[in-house]
């Protein structure tokens, strides 16, 4: 579903990254420097195909707008990590690509650690999604 995302990110960081390298490059990690070399190989046609794929995904998602006010997913594909790790934010990639608001609600728990539920809404419906999230948090406190 998100195969175009790395290409979009690569294209959008290509020139700022090159500017950092030009100034000396010591401000970036070796891993990022390697990625910049990969980004250099990308061309405008690849970027445009990636944008078209993103547009198609957003159009498909828009068909659900009258069907659902929100969607519930987990915030992370695994249980909460122990400090100092922060976990995997892969579910946030979906809402970012869709241009959809998302709220992480600490509704679950594992090993005494909060485990978030992600409430994702329709684009430009941030306020409505916030109201739903507030209601969900209230229900959990009462229950």
Predicted region positions:
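Positions that flank functional sites
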Residues: 1, 79-80, 110
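Short helix-loop capping/hinge segments that flank enzyme active sites or metal/cofactor-binding pockets
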Residues: 4-58, 106-116
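Short, surface-exposed loop/helix-turn segments at secondary-structure junctions
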Residues: 5, 49, 76-94
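Structural helix-boundary/capping segments
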Residues: 48, 52, 97-143
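Short amphipathic alpha-helices and their capping/turn segments at secondary-structure boundaries
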Residues: 59-64
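Conserved acidic residues
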Residues: 69
């Amino acid at each position: 579903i998100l195969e175009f995302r790395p290409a979009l990110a690569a294209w959008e960081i290509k020139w700022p990254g090159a500017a950092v390298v030009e100034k000396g490059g010591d401000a970036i990690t070796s891993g990022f420097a390697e990625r910049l070399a990969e980004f250099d190989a990308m061309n405008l046609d690849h970027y445009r195909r990636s944008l078209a794929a993103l547009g198609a995904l957003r159009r498909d998602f828009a068909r659900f707008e009258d069907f659902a006010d929100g969607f519930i997913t987990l915030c992370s594909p695994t249980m909460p990590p122990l400090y100092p790790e922060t976990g995997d934010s892969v579910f946030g990639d979906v809402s970012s690509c869709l241009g959809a608001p998302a709220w992480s609600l600490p509704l679950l728990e594992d090993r005494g650690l909060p485990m978030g539920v992600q409430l994702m809404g329709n684009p430009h419906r941030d306020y409505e999604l916030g109201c739903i999230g507030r209601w969900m948090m209230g229900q959990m406190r009462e229950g």
